[in-house]
């Protein structure tokens, strides 16, 4: 039996909240901040920190705008983020050729 190599897990994704963000965006393509906050049952501060980590890794793009006078923050998964998430799932499923 092959030993699972935890070093192949992408640290930018491997965290409960960051994994949840990536899984949600992989299906939805984009979401607004409050939608993610509600779906993931996260606090505003915690979600902001984890989105910044994913943004720094190049896995999500965060766009800020206004809808009338109300600020709107939209989060999109990037092509690099989609590839990284697919590779992460490959590693978890035991496929040795993780996509990068």
List each model region and its residues.
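N-terminal helix-turn-helix DNA-binding core of bacterial DNA-binding proteins
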Residues: 5-46, 65-76
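Accessory beta->alpha helical hairpin/"wing" motif in late/C-terminal subdomains of nucleic-acid enzymes
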Residues: 77-81
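Glycine-centered, phosphate/nucleic-acid-interacting loop/turn motifs that mediate DNA/RNA or nucleotide
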Residues: 58
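Amphipathic alpha-helical dimerization/coiled-coil segments
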Residues: 1-6, 23-24, 82-100
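Generic serine detector
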Residues: 48, 65, 93-96
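Short, hydrophobic-biased segments on the C-terminal half of alpha helices
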Residues: 51-52
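Short beta-strand "wing" residues that participate in macromolecule-binding interfaces
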Residues: 62
């Amino acid at each position: 039996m092959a030993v699972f190599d935890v070093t192949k897990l992408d640290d930018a994704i491997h965290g409960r909240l960051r994994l949840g963000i990536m899984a949600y965006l992989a299906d939805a393509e984009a979401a607004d901040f409050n939608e993610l906050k509600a779906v993931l049952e996260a606090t505003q501060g915690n979600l902001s920190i984890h989105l910044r980590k994913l943004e720094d890794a190049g896995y999500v793009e965060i766009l800020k705008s206004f809808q009338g006078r109300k600020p709107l923050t939209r989060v999109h998964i990037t092509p690099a983020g989609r590839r990284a998430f697919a590779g992460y799932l490959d590693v978890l499923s035991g496929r040795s050729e993780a996509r990068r």
